[in-house]
Regions:
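Short glycine-rich anion-binding loops that position phosphate/pyrophosphate groups of nucleotides
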Residues: 25-26, 166-168
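Conserved TIR/SEFIR loop-to-helix hotspot centered on a Trp-containing motif
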Residues: 171
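Long, low-complexity, Lys/Arg-enriched
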Residues: 2-159, 174-242
Length: 242
């Protein structure tokens, strides 16, 4: 009995909430003068709680008591700001190397050039995934391959919370497709539990406050579509009962 309890305890301890977010270029960063720009700070509110922050992902991380953040971004994304934000004792030389690299990169740069950026987040809660711009099918296929690396960062039982506030608008669609494939075809029992969006565009109508919108209805629609397919094709109503 004790062995079973220890096994259950170990399984529970491995389960975690993981934020997956997209990282943009942060239009307020002055790369030429190496100014450490960032997203504009605002007062986010979610579940009747307020958080003053620049990153929606950081708000979600704290609000849901997550374990780590997987940031998906290009070589031009503001990794320097993320480094400043999440590394306990930032090294100015490391930051400068990141900033200079970002400034020199473009859409044609090979993703392997960003290996030093990835290494700079070792032993932190940040897990970077580098992607291309997705300008054509070849780049989109490469991005899909990159996103499959997320599977290695997840443990069985993990809950995924997706933040779609920033980054290229096409990427959340690609991400959800990849995650659904991982969920259906890999042995890890992971699930997407939430999709959120920081609606900064209407903060001027909300007295400067920015709502974090819950888009879980999309997950429900997807689940219903799957259940309908199972029922119509195989007469299986089990998923409906869930």
């Amino acid at each position: 009995m004790m062995c079973i309890w220890k096994l259950l305890k170990n399984l529970i301890s491995k389960m975690a909430k993981v934020i997956i977010s997209f990282l943009g270029t942060g239009g307020y960063s002055d790369r030429e003068s190496k100014c450490r720009g960032e997203y504009r700070e605002t007062t986010y509110f979610i579940d009747n709680k307020e958080y003053i922050n620049s990153f929606v992902s950081d708000v979600l991380f704290k609000h849901y008591e997550a374990e780590k953040i997987i940031y998906i971004g290009t070589l031009k994304s503001m990794w320097d700001v993320v480094y400043d934000t999440y590394v306990d004792t930032p090294n100015d030389e490391v930051w400068e190397n990141i900033a200079e690299s970002i400034n020199s990169f473009n859409h044609q740069t090979d993703l392997s050039k960003g290996n030093d950026i990835i290494k700079s987040f070792d032993k932190t809660i940040i897990c970077p995934i580098l992607i291309r711009y997705g300008l054509n099918n070849q780049e989109n296929e490469e991005n899909i391959k990159q996103l499959f690396e997320i599977e290695k960062l997840l443990n069985s039982g993990d809950e995924i919370l997706i933040d779609i506030t920033h980054g290229f608008r096409s990427m959340p669609i690609v991400l959800v497709g990849v995650l659904n494939f991982i969920i259906e075809n890999f042995k890890k029992k992971i699930k997407i539990s939430k999709i959120s969006y920081g609606m900064f565009e209407i903060s001027h109508e909300m007295e400067g406050r920015t709502p974090i919108v819950d888009l879980d209805v999309l997950l429900e629609l997807q689940a219903n579509a799957k259940a309908s397919h199972e029922f119509s094709e195989y007469g299986n109503a089990y998923i409906y009962s869930e």
